[in-house]
Amino acid sequence: MAKKQSGQPLTAEQKRQMRRRRSRRRAVLRGIALVLVCVIVVLLWQNWDVVAPDRLYSHIQDLLGSSTGSYPVDFSGVGVQRLARVDNYSVVLTDSHLIYLNQSGAEVNRISCAYPSALMCTTDQYVLVAEQGGRRIQLSTRTSVVTEMEVDNEIIAVALNDKGQMAVLMQGSQGYLVQIKVYDRKGKLLYTRSRNQTATEIALSPDGRQVALLSIKALNGTLTSAMDVFSLTTSDTEALCSHKEADTLLYRMEYLSDGWVVAFSEDRAVMMDTANGLASVYVPSDMRVLGYAVGSDTMALVLRSYGSTGDGEVHIVNKEGVPTATIPFEGVYRDLSQQKGLYVLLTDTYAQRITANGEQVRVSVEEDGRQAVLDGDNVVVLGLNRLLSYPLT
């Protein structure tokens, strides 16, 4: 059949075919658009605590200086339990609220949180508060409460990672001594396990693939502490790796980066590589551990000689248990914290910023300081009943 000449009118059949082709194209485009809308809606729902408009609005408010208030911040008549650093804000946990303060000391948000005996974990974005000996937990961000729930039994310890995943160590049931549960940031149960061990501490890996349990038991009259690591991605009930320290009471445990977990006692730090179960132990000579802080690749230990009542040293130690810096300090130790690889030491007379290489800057502070965090080039110190900010020069 000869082709239709240019300019020749289309037949009715040709017009119908063109309409059908256009209709099919429109249907395909509508289907693609619908899928994209569904994907966007799901992503927004899953990450609303991160992308919520009020979060952006709050930051704009701070930039424009619409929040009022300044340092020092008075907390007279209010019981202040903890000071932390979250999402570039200083966060104060009181008897009744989580209070967020910007760099000027202005209050930018407060979240109701009235737990009589509170445990608090923080990451760069999330704050987890749990009722020790109770059953309530609350996960929040700078702008809102993400999850508020009750667990099955009394809480012993909690842990939190950067994804907002929460690990809860609680009293056991049905004949077990303890129960471990891990939830996502929305409160969905990801993992549960019961153990017949006297467990005291729990830690959650940054990637959410492992949970570590610290337990104690007596073997042949000797107290032994055990570090056990379990997989959250398999159904295996046995530990991936374990390490035991005889005649030692390990009392705190945290994850570093790259699958390393560290635990502390009065006289040592124990680092275990969960990839192979090999552990290294750092035991400072004739000194006891007063405090610690954990970064991504290093940790800092506050040490004091046995028999001494003042002065001491801060040791920066890497994952292999090798000290990389030693910093002497004077006075009475009060607090040690870590933000983004920098440590801040607080004594009764000064605060000191310390890098992983041992570089340091100090500033004199009032004598009633209890806790300290870094705020850019300032250090924020919690005293008996007020919060003060000091420039590090």
Give each language-model segment a name.
Residues M1-A27:
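N-terminal Lys/Arg-rich, disordered targeting/topogenic segments
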Residues L29-Q46:
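Hydrophobic membrane-insertion alpha-helices, especially the h-region
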Residues W48-D49, H97-I99, R135-L139, G175-K181, ...:
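Structural motif
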Residues D62-F75, S104-S112, T143-E150, G187-S194, ...:
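A short beta-strand motif characteristic of beta-propeller blades
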Residues S70, D74-A84, C113-Q125, N153-D162, ...:
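Repeated scaffold domains used in trafficking and secretory/extracellular systems
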Residues S90, V127, M166-A167, G208-V211, ...:
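Hydrophobic beta-strand positions that form the internal "hydrophobic ladder"
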Residues N109-L214, G221:
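Non-cytosolic head/periplasmic domains of membrane-anchored proteins
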Residues Y176-V270:
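Solenoidal tandem-repeat scaffolds enriched in leucines and small polar residues
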